[in-house]
């Protein structure tokens, strides 16, 4: 295995789907070609692989994929690895419902897709809905090309991204202030009412508990008064008990201390009750009701105090709102000027290097037997990437009218540029029938492009022609035996026979084998 940081799928196991009763394949890095007669289950195999990543519905009772992804951060999902090169295992079990697991940790399908997002890049017939060849990608490629040519370009892009992000934040804050300004009078009235409601209460941390205690005392003060008075009367004569104990030679110090403490506690409670005599029960209940409402509205007295501070701050800010708006306006205008200047500098670089990039794109397209495409810079609303967009021109064609084969080859041309200048794709390429309906010459061109891409990414490609299997590092054959679909990785001798079958079927088998050996260089 090559020592690189890209994802690599090392194994696929499938149990009981519509085609395969049992499937167990091990994969190596590089290009893996998948071939076989029509209807044996090649696309079903690819669908099972995509199903493990949540990109298709699971088509089997059990799918298991082993992969190595050193850069993937799994700790956030409770999956810890001692070694980042330790294989991860995705399991998909389908019974009444479909369940997803990563290293035996259960995850929802959406969570799994979010974690593995971007690890699988697929070229298929629904490519236009994916909008892969968009102006963001093309502009990123041009910028990557310029960065490779001129080191002064990257600082400009970084500075623009930082300043534009700050500009957007300030504009959002200014809009929020302006909204407040439009409703300033109404907002001030509501905040002042809330401030008055909170300030007229004594928002002490223990105030609610203190009032509850007062309510309890008031409701039972007469009974408590009688009990305390009776107890204090009894304590008046306890000296007779302690004197008698001392007379017969026993110490009464402990009892004296306890009786003194009991007397002090009762006198303290009696003082509380006397204080209650001065309380207005209606006012206590009224304030208690208000505090209950505050706790219900704000969660606690502490939260109400925090809210009071926030309300006061908001009222202060409303008084300063005109000043703040003016400050925001000046800062926004300053940042706009700086961003526009950076956009002009970036635009200058793009115009200078566009011809060279177009020449490179044309060369890639020519290698893939396509008419030369060209990219044209047009003005666009300012963003963190500048104030331009790239528009793809295809001589006498429109992108939407390209055949599936033409589009796939054009996408390959851009992939080759991505590999060279962006180097940020660390996933696996899955190509579904890439060479179907292509001429032999076109298929040969595609195989060369895939061979180049496979030095950077693992690739799985269903193939109907000999050129992709001939350059593939691994060749997987899907076939039927006793009416059951099977799949296996071919050795060199088996590869020769399969490529010979693809060339000429059962006719001219000797010349087909000779040609297959020549293609495989064996």
Swiss-Prot record:
GO molecular function of the protein, one example? ATP binding
* Single GO BP term: SOS response
Q: Name one Pfam family in it.
A: SMC_N
**Key words, A-Z:** ATP-binding, DNA damage, DNA repair, Nucleotide-binding
Q: Might you report a single GO cellular component term?
A: bacterial nucleoid
Question: Which residues does the record give as ATP binding sites?
Answer: 36-43
Q: Which domain of life is it from?
A: Bacteria
Q: Which SUPFAM superfamilies match?
A: P-loop containing nucleoside triphosphate hydrolases (SSF52540)
Q: Which residues cross the membrane?
A: none
- Family recorded in the similarity comment: Belongs to the RecN family.
Protein function: May be involved in recombinational repair of damaged DNA.
- Which PANTHER family does this chain map to? DNA REPAIR PROTEIN RECN
Q: What is this protein called?
A: DNA repair protein RecN
């Amino acid at each position: 295995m090559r020592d690189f940081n890209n994802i690599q799928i090392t194994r696929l196991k499938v149990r009981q789907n519509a085609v395969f009763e049992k499937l167990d394949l091990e994969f190596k890095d590089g290009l893996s070609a998948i071939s076989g007669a029509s209807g044996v289950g090649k696309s079903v195999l690819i669908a099972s692989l995509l199903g493990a990543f949540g990109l298709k519905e699971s088509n089997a009772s059990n799918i298991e994929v082993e992969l190595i992804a050193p850069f993937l951060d799994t700790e956030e999902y409770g999956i810890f690895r001692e070694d980042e090169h330790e294989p991860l295992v995705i399991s998909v079990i389908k019974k009444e419902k479909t369940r997803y697991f990563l290293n035996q940790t259960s995850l929802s399908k959406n969570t799994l897709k979010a974690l593995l997002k971007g690890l699988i890049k697929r070229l298929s017939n629904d490519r236009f809905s994916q909008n892969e060849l968009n102006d963001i990608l093309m502009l990123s490629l041009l910028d990557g090309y310029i960065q490779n040519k001129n080191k002064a370009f990257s600082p400009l892009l970084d500075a623009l991204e930082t300043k534009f992000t700050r500009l957007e934040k300030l504009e959002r804050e200014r809009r929020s202030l302006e909204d407040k300004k439009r409703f300033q009078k109404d907002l001030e009235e509501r905040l002042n009412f809330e401030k008055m409601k909170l300030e007229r209460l004594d928002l002490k941390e223990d105030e609610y508990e203190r009032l509850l205690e007062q309510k309890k005392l008031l409701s039972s003060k007469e009974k408590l008064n009688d009990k305390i008075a009776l107890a204090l009367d009894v304590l008046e004569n306890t000296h007779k008990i302690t004197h008698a104990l001392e007379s017969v030679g026993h110490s009464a110090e402990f009892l004296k201390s306890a009786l003194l403490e009991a007397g002090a506690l009762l006198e303290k409670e009696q003082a509380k009750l006397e204080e209650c005599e001065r309380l207005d029960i209606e006012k206590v209940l009224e304030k208690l009701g208000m505090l209950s409402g505050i706790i219900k509205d704000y969660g606690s007295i502490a939260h109400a105090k925090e809210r009071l501070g926030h309300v006061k701050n908001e009222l202060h800010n409303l008084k300063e709102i005109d000043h703040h708006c003016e400050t925001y306006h000046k800062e926004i205008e300053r940042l706009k000027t700086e961003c526009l200047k950076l956009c002009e500098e970036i635009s200058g670089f793009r115009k200078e290097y566009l011809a060279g990039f177009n020449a490179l794109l044309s060369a890639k397209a020519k290698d893939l037997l396509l008419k030369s495409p060209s990219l044209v810079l047009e003005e666009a609303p300012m963003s963190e990437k500048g104030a331009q967009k790239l528009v793809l021109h295809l001589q006498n064609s429109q992108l939407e009218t390209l055949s599936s084969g033409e589009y796939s080859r054009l996408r390959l041309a851009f992939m080759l540029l991505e590999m060279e200048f962006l180097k940020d794709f660390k996933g696996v390429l899955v190509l579904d029938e890439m060479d179907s309906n292509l001429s032999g010459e076109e298929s040969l061109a595609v195989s060369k492009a895939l061979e180049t891409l496979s030095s950077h990414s693992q690739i799985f490609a269903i193939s109907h022609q000999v050129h992709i299997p001939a350059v593939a590092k691994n060749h997987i054959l899907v076939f039927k035996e006793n009416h059951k679909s099977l799949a296996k990785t071919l050795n060199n001798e088996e590869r020769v026979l399969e490529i010979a079958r693809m060339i000429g079927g059962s006719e001219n088998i000797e010349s087909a084998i000779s040609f297959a050996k020549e293609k495989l260089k064996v």
